[in-house]
Amino acid sequence: MASILTTTEAQTRRREQYHEADVVVVGAGVFGCTMAFALANQGRSVLLLERWLKEPDRIVGELLQPGGVASLQKLGLGHCVEGIDAKPCYGYTIFYHGEKVLVPYPGIDDEGSPTHAWGGHSTGDRSTRPSGCSFHHGRFINKLRESCIAHKNITVVETEVVKTLRGEVSDQILGVESRTMNKETGKKEQDYYFGQLTIIADGYDSKWRQEVLKTKPKVCSKFYALELIDCDLPQPGHGHVIIGNAFPILLYQIGTHETRALIDVPQGIPEASPENGGVRGYIRNFVLPALPPSIRPSAEKALEDGKIPRSMPNSWLPPTKQRANGAILLGDAMNMRHPLTGGGMTVAFNDVVILSELLHPDKVGDLGDSKLINNALEELYWRRKPLTGIINVLAQALYSLFAANDRQLRALQYGCFTYFKNGDTDGPVALLAGILQRPFILAYHFFSVAFLAIWLNACSVVGCGILGIFKFPLAIIDAVLILWKACIVFIPIMWRESFQ
């Protein structure tokens, strides 16, 4: 508690001269910056360490759902999406083999809840609907870092953390060892930073995950990225999901002239083999024909450089309970989902809101008290599930449907598109947007889609002729298989993410 009550000048001197703070945060990315800022706002002294402070150039972390915007504003960082040419996002447009349906974010009531959570859609104008935004990832991160640098309780240091420091007589983590560039010699020198609590948020490729959590993410595919210039989007201000003869494609504006295209390529598919031209061959032969005609010219131009597009692995890493021994692992290092639904930053900001509340000095006076920290982590684990569980389940389940590779999944895929086309959009998109946190509504909509898929498939199999009665047993068999597939896709992930 004493370190909180010292003067700002003394805290700054401790950080800059002695490399000591209440909290050491490793990683100045989406989670690390916001966590450092939230703790500093509570009077904590924070050291924020980052290996590379130049503007990052990444292809994910560019789409922020309305729930994430609300959390960012709650943290006092809403200004970070201003002045970076961010574009508003009002919902999604889904293309299914050329046919499209608009899925706008839902209308909400005075308490912020969607007005048609269980079914149907609202008809109000945009003034009653929340919006998200999309932007260049690097510009957004720079804004977050600038806010941290300007904060009187934060010292930001460019240094590469190489290992954690433990006590001689206990396993307690006391801080980190790093390598810092000496500007005079141009060589990296050994350095040390100490804190009552070390928060590690070093991203999807965390080098501390195995040490702290002993878990590994499951990688099912990669997103290959194109940046389309002056793309003629069919529905500006909306994310576009393309479902066709290619695996899912996601497009959204990241600036006035730039549109990001993320192309899902599962591992080992023959269409992207070297004999078929590799990833570029797959994009040219399968992705371009699946795109709406207005998008193709800019996509073709983006392929002209002859290079393999940049890629990122699409991973699933369920959350893990952890016991603090002076350090905790958070952000993408602890929990990931498929980025198709653009929910990663919304999850991160929600975690920061909850954890900063649980670690408030009124509740945890001494961040070195492992018992209090562990109690906070236990509560975080369960309190985050109503939002993060839903977003994680949706990400994995929708990817399974949109990347359908068998007859039952294709039936569910068509059922999902028809469900949206019938106007049942507000509930599902409110869950996706992070503004509806009720897992049972998610289950209701998923199995409503499943039973609609069963009905549509039965109508297709039986037909309208008199001989259709003889095909009825086939429709029954299909119904069982489709329902079974829906259960396999949904229930294990729902159980793991929301109830375990």
Curated annotation (Swiss-Prot):
| Reactions it catalyzes | squalene + reduced [NADPH--hemoprotein reductase] + O2 = (S)-2,3-epoxysqualene + oxidized [NADPH--hemoprotein reductase] + H2O + H(+)
Q: What InterPro entries would the database entry show? A: FAD-dep_OxRdtase, FAD/NAD-bd_sf, Squalene_epoxidase, Squalene_monox
Q: Mainly localized where?
A: membrane
Q: Which Gene Ontology molecular function entries are recorded, alphabetically?
A: flavin adenine dinucleotide binding; squalene monooxygenase activity
Task: Quote the pathway field.
Answer: Terpene metabolism; lanosterol biosynthesis; lanosterol from farnesyl diphosphate: step 2/3; Steroid metabolism; ergosterol biosynthesis
- One example of a Gene Ontology biological process annotation: ergosterol biosynthetic process
Misc remark? In Fusarium, the biosynthesis pathway of the sterol precursors leading to the prevalent sterol ergosterol differs from yeast. The ringsystem of lanosterol in S.cerevisiae is firstly demethylised in three enzymatic steps leading to the intermediate zymosterol and secondly a methyl group is added to zymosterol by the sterol 24-C-methyltransferase to form fecosterol. In Fusarium, lanosterol is firstly transmethylated by the sterol 24-C-methyltransferase leading to the intermediate eburicol and secondly demethylated in three steps to form fecosterol.
State the protein's name: Squalene epoxidase ERG1
In its UniProt entry, the species of origin is given as: Gibberella zeae (strain ATCC MYA-4620 / CBS 123657 / FGSC 9075 / NRRL 31084 / PH-1)
